[in-house]
Each structure stands twice: as C-alpha cells, then as structure tokens.
C-alpha cells in the first residue's frame, strides 16, 4: 500500500502567504485555500477538493488552520 503524502503548511509570513511543502518539497507560497488546492493538484494529488482541510490527517497546519492566511 502506498504511503500518503505528508503536507505541511507553514505559519503565515509577515508579508503574507504560507509556504506549502509536500514530502519535504516546497511547492510555493499560498495566499489562500485556492492557491493551496492548486499546489496540491499540480503535485499530482487527485480529488483534493474533497479533503476536509480542517481535519485531514494528510495535512499538518502550523500557526493556524485553513482560515488563517
């Protein structure tokens, strides 16, 4: 069985946005949920729009959840 990717969303930066990593690779800086989901889609994660962003065990939110940007 394939291991699920580890998604880490860093705390908001002082200038805005949050760095997003998947399995240690930086995908970019997201400025909102739309950016975040697009990064995941480009990384090959399918059906990301159906993830419960608040409680998904795939996502580690640091410095606030999906409503903090």
What are these regions (language model features)?
Residues 1-13:
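Short N-terminal "domain-start" leader segments
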Residues 7, 18, 59:
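A broad, low-specificity signal marking well-ordered, structured residues that form hydrophobic/aromatic
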Residues 42-69:
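Mixed-charge, Lys/Arg-enriched low-complexity segments
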Residues 11-52:
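Amphipathic, hydrophobic secondary-structure cores in small proteins
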């Amino acid at each position: 069985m394939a291991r699920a990717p580890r998604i880490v969303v860093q705390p908001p930066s002082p200038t805005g946005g949050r760095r997003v990593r998947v399995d240690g690779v930086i995908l970019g800086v997201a400025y909102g949920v739309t950016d975040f989901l697009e990064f995941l889609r480009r990384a090959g994660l399918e059906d990301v729009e159906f993830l419960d962003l608040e409680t998904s065990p795939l996502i580690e939110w640091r410095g606030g959840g999906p409503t903090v940007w």
